[in-house]
Structures are given as structure tokens and as C-alpha cells.
């Protein structure tokens, strides 16, 4: 499994009602052993999470299943991350 950094950046039309469904999505990923860590940015402009996936396509699919992406509330960006 490779590590992928997922950035969630709030859009102007951000819907605060998507926060709880987003947390539920992260909980599902954590239960599957695919989430290493996650958290919001201190300025509340968005957040990031570290996702484990077999490929970039798998990571993008998991990140795009996030309600923040599905609702259009946040831009979701995925990068393969060679963290040491």
C-alpha cells in the first residue's frame, strides 16, 4: 500500500452540514485500515488526511467518495506522498 495525502479545501459555497458525513466517511476508512491520520487546518480553510491505497486511482476513488467532494463543498486533491 502507498500513502496518499488528501487535501480538502473549502469552497465559498461550503456547507457546514457536510462535516458530520465527512467524519463518518473518515471513520469508515479508519475501520478499513486505510486512514493513518486526519485533521482540520487551524484556520478552518479545510483539512487533510493520510490515506493508504494500492494505486492513485484507488486513492482518488476513496477521496471522491467523501461527502465534501460529492456535495461540492470542498475541492479534494490527492497526491501520492513519499513521506519518510
Kindly label every feature range from the protein language model.
Residues 1-84:
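Conserved, structured core segments of small domains
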Amino acid at each position: 500500500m502507498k500513502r496518499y495525502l488528501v487535501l480538502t479545501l473549502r469552497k465559498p459555497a461550503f456547507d457546514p452540514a457536510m462535516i458530520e458525513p465527512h467524519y463518518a466517511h473518515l471513520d469508515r476508512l479508519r475501520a478499513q485500515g486505510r486512514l493513518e491520520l486526519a485533521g482540520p487546518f487551524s484556520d478552518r480553510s479545510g483539512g487533510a488526511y493520510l490515506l493508504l491505497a494500492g494505486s492513485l486511482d484507488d486513492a482518488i476513488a476513496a477521496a471522491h467518495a467523501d461527502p465534501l467532494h460529492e456535495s461540492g463543498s470542498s475541492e479534494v486533491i490527492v497526491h501520492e506522498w513519499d513521506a519518510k
